[in-house]
A protein has these predicted regions:
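Membrane-proximal envelope and lipid/glycan-remodeling enzymes
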Residues: 3-557
Length: 557
């Protein structure tokens, strides 16, 4: 067994996998030509916090003020390296280089996981190579955010935790020689994972609960947990200081954005909501590019592929499938949404194409074994044809996501950035303004920005949830707001009401105030819509209003 696996762990296989991921990166990277930027406004929130950390020695979105704003403390620290060492360089390329340097190892880790588990070669190829052809997964590397790091650290922790067997180390069949080292390294990976995103803590629970099936001892668990705590405690301290809770306040703000509530809830309604959104947006539209129900066939095959991996339990690939399921389940009650471009569900983006292929492989094997026993010689050619078909289907997503990347960057640069430039030209530094999409405007403008999305100030959330946002702004002397909204087409194209945020924040049809429109920035509908249907990155317009507060007598009249 050892001799059979060893040739699959040589440099030529790693080069093949790396070449596939580099090709995927180059394919989407063409969307950056004359169009450098981030496809999401949230990307600039991380940049603002990293810059503030270096300039003001404070962790927060508001310069010089300790506050919330990011759900990933570890990613903020990584981005701050750019401002510490290369402050004059573009903030776009540093996270792209980091994510590119992480997404290639994610494929190599998948390959090693499959090889160590003894999966058939064609299964290993599907698991390692197909994500490189997924435009949606490769797109994560261009967001400037932490999701590729999260996926790669997860794969690393799973691989390390199962290294106790030492299958390739001669003369050490029990793995006792490297058990200490790999348990410490696993703790390091798990700690960094929990500091990258709070739901990463669940992988620690899963690995430690299954330690016996992974060939580990209680001592290994204690060592790994002790190392992980070194990372998790600082993350919890930061959250307590900025949000008043162990979890970042951004989760509550995002729950309001996607569900109009900040409460945790688990039930059939949240499971149904997340499942329906995952199927309609991530699978049916973003992967298959169809509105037809035939996409459900792919979902069924992927579920069957997941079952194929789980029936091999205990091994690394089955644990990866369990972790993907646990991660998805955590979002059913923590934040029942797929996020912009499916970014909250990186394992769906990573594993859907391979699971689809593995499901096909197993069905073909069953047919050859039981229904057509005389065709066993055709098993590998048939599985190879299935792999080519799934690869072609997956690769077709690359050009679509290149267009989505290009157009969403164009929207952020020609709407949000243009608004920031307008503010710098027409208002003195320190002018107080309430803003909903805070990333780009907060990074590039010199205004005193007041967050309206519930991501920064924990004292704001009670006002947001009780419909008293105008009162919050009036108490702080804020006379301007910038609201994101769609054009009139939002009523019929399913992208959202033009007055959604104005209504939810109680600025429209409010007898206690009047809004006077000052300036608006936006882009053409076709360009905006071509990216929005894939990423839901931002509304089409950013409009600046003056708030005229009315006295009680005037409001009563």
């Amino acid at each position: 067994m050892e001799d059979r696996r060893r040739p699959l762990l040589t440099g030529r296989w790693y080069l093949l996998i790396a070449a596939a991921y580099l090709a995927g990166l180059l394919s989407l990277g063409a969307g950056l030509r004359h169009n450098v930027g981030f496809p999401l406004d949230d990307s600039w929130i991380h940049q603002q916090m990293a810059r503030n950390l270096v300039r003001y020695r404070s962790f927060g979105f508001t310069p010089g003020v300790t506050s919330s704003g990011s759900s990933s403390a570890f990613w903020t620290f990584i981005l701050s390296i750019n401002y510490l060492l290369f402050p004059a360089h573009s903030p776009v390329f540093f996270p792209l280089i980091v994510n590119a340097a992480l997404i290639v190892p994610s494929g190599i880790l998948l390959w090693r996981i499959a090889v160590f588990d003894g999966l058939p070669l064609i299964y290993a190829l599907a698991l390692a190579l197909l994500p490189a052809l997924s435009g949606n997964y490769i797109w994560l590397a261009f967001t400037g955010m932490e999701h590729v790091l999260f996926a790669t650290l997860s794969l690393l922790a799973i691989l390390l935790w199962f290294r106790a067997g030492g299958v390739l180390r001669r003369g050490d069949a029990t793995g006792s020689g490297n058990a200490l080292r790999t348990s410490l390294l696993t703790g390091l990976a798990l700690g960094a994972l929990g500091m990258t995103r709070p739901e990463g803590l669940a992988l620690s629970v899963l690995l430690f609960a299954l330690y016996r099936w992974c060939g580990r001892s209680v001592s290994d668990v204690l060592r790994a947990a002790a190392v992980a705590v070194l990372f998790l405690v600082p993350a919890f301290v930061i959250n307590l200081k900025t949000s008043g809770t162990l979890l970042p306040m951004t989760l509550r703000g995002r729950r309001f954005l996607f569900g109009n509530t900040d409460k945790l809830h688990v039930g059939w309604s949240t499971v149904r909501e997340l499942t329906r959104e995952t199927y309609a947006k991530v699978i049916q539209h973003n992967f298959f590019h169809t509105a037809s129900g035939w996409a459900m066939v792919g979902v069924v095959l992927a579920f069957y592929g997941c079952f194929v991996l789980l029936r091999r339990f205990p091994n690394r690939t089955s644990l990866l499938a369990l972790w993907a399921m646990l991660h998805y389940a955590s979002y059913c009650f923590m934040l029942p949404a797929t996020g912009h471009g499916g970014r909250y569900q990186p394992f769906v983006l990573l594993l859907f194409p391979p699971l689809l292929a593995i499901g096909l492989f197993d069905l073909i094997a069953l047919i050859c074994r039981f229904l057509l026993p005389r065709t066993r010689a055709l098993l590998l050619p048939a599985q190879s044809m299935a792999l080519i078909a799934v690869a072609a289907l997956t690769a077709a997503t690359l050009p679509r996501w290149r267009v989505a990347l290009r157009d969403s960057i164009y929207d952020i640069d020609n709407c949000h950035l243009k608004m920031a430039e307008y503010l710098n030209e027409h208002y003195p530094p320190g002018t107080k303004m309430g803003v909903f999409d805070i990333g780009t405007i907060g990074y590039f403008s010199h205004i005193d920005l007041i967050d309206l999305g519930g991501l920064v100030d924990r004292n704001y959330l009670p006002y947001l949830m009780s419909g008293r946002v105008p009162q919050y702004l009036e108490e702080r002397g804020v006379n301007y707001i910038i609201l994101a909204h769609n054009g009139p087409e939002g009523e019929y194209d399913g992208t959202g009401s033009p007055t959604r945020f104005g209504d939810e924040l109680h600025f429209f049809r409010n007898p206690a105030l009047r809004l006077e429109e000052i300036h608006s920035e936006g882009i053409d509908y076709p360009t905006w819509y071509s990216s929005y249907v894939y990423t839901q990155h931002a509304y089409r317009f950013q409009t600046l209003y003056r708030i005229v507060y009315l006295n009680q007598d005037t409001a009563a009249k």
